[in-house]
Amino acid sequence: MLKKNIFIVVLLLFWVRIQAQEDNSVFQFLKLPFSSHAAALGGENISIIEDDLTMAVHNPALLSCVADKTLNLNYTLYIAGVNAASAAFSRVLGDRSTWAVTAQFVNYGTMKETTSENIITGTFSAKDMAFSGIYSYDLSDYWSGGVKANLIYSNYDKFSSFAIGVDLGLNYYHQNSDFSFSMVARNLGGQIVAFEDKREKLPVDVQVGITKRLSHAPFRISATLYNLTDWKNSKFFDHAVIGMDFLPTDNFYVSLGYNFRRTNEMKVADSSHWAGFTAGAGLQIKRFKLGAAYAKYHLSTSSLLFNLSMTL
């Protein structure tokens, strides 16, 4: 009980500390979905209880659900031809603890370098990287907590930056009712080396989420509130994501999601052209798990995310 209370107090203290932060942060790639399942449920989910290592990147407390010696590989085809790859590996420590390591790489390709008169003077490349360690602990039969430490590096042409960040997660799960509640504070930390003279903030994100499986139907409903420290020029639903899983068997799911902010920000001529809608599916074949997600961002832009996990 004491450890559970400590985790709750720490999360609340960080909530108060970052309420005044402005949305002028760097390392925006940290907001990209790591999990195809989370991406399929609207892009944000911190409360799905599954043996899914990728979900522990969204909420480190969920690492307690992951099997020993799980290896995960991911690939994302993002908007504008941006490519991202990531990997993770987990180990169980005793009855209550689990640890994992992850790596993420985003490649923006080669771009033209031009003057203010649009004269091409050369080319340059840009990339982002993050390396993380995750630890989770079962605080009781219902509560679990987790922490994720991140080493973050970005390089854009002649400019580079290095930062250290921490994610904190807490989850409550009642197995009999199949109800899950989570709180997460992500990207707490700062730059060690700035791009230029002035240090900039990390994209801090406080989230709360719930997931409930229906008792007499093969459906699971999720709702997540995110970016709760920044309410400038935004309404309540701009912070909301909803999603639903169809679970005909224990080894297969189909997901649909909706992100209200994406719809509002990407409207063209009073039409969203399906921006904000997401979909995906997952399949388990023995010790292998496959997942895929599609997300619509704009009339002409979308993304695809693929996960492959296996138990060694």
Q: Would you name each region that the model predicts?
A:
Residues M1-E22:
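Bacterial Sec-dependent N-terminal signal peptides
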Residues Q21-L312:
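Subset of outer-membrane beta-barrel
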